[in-house]
Amino acid sequence: MERVNLFFLHGFLGRPSDWAVVKAHLPQHDGLRIFTPDYFKDASLGPQHTFEEWAGNFIKLVEAHGCAGERNILIGYSLGGRLALHALEKKPALWYKTILVSTNPGFNDPHESFDPISEERRQRWMNDSYWAEEFLKAPWETVLRNWNAQPVFGGGETEPLRIEKEYSRETLSLALTQWSLAQQKNMRSLIQKNIQKVIWMVGERDEKFMEMSRRLQEEVQGLRLETVPASSHRVLFDSPKDLGERIRQLIQQLL
């Protein structure tokens, strides 16, 4: 029997511990291995690397764990979902399934990275650059309060307590520009090519991402879209038991 390997990628400001409740709902089985890399602490996975460089380094990490040829499932939340898309692009055959939670597929345009000719990308770049400066210099409590007050995070639980000493401000700041949505290419064709591998999850109270996901269903034929009840953008914190149960059902048939 092939082993099943789960790789969880947290979001911006995230920690591996964010997945604790999800992991608690998964079966205890000798054939199941769980990995929760901390890409803000691992130099090979940090934002000093571009999306493409990051994907190459992440694939090396996965293969170093002896996972090639096994059932590998990649679960990414928010920024972690966008990174997961690049890992899927880098080596599709490595992944049995990719679960993308509260994930943005990128602007629906032909640009490969930031291009000021795109008004959408220019506006996003300006916004992310503002936050990069805030995370670098503003008082920690102030920047966290303002970050959490953004409309996209409304209607749900706040994140766990984030303690300044557990982070490098320089790393957080760099992540906001290096991995800005303005730098990300359109991933719709990738999703279409790997449609059998992709599970797209979104919280039903996440108005922005619900609308985006419905459009994505029209743009990508056969997309498996799962709506998580009573959840905002922060599905991971609003409904970790629900998320864990969905993953459990997926892997139960493989063990």
Give the positions of each predicted feature.
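Conserved HGGG/HGGXW glycine-rich cap/lid loop of the alpha/beta-hydrolase fold
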Residues: 2-45
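Conserved acidic catalytic loop of the alpha/beta-hydrolase fold
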Residues: 53-72
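Gly/Ala-rich beta-loop-alpha elbow adjacent to hydrolase catalytic centers
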Residues: 76-80, 84
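Flexible "cap/lid" loop of the alpha/beta hydrolase fold
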Residues: 89, 97-134
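Hydrophobic, aromatic-rich cap/lid helix
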Residues: 159-190
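Short beta-strand/loop motif that positions the catalytic acidic residue
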Residues: 194, 200-202
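Conserved alpha/beta-hydrolase "acid-adjacent" motif
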Residues: 207-212
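Catalytic histidine-centered segment of alpha/beta-hydrolase-like enzymes
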Residues: 231-240, 244
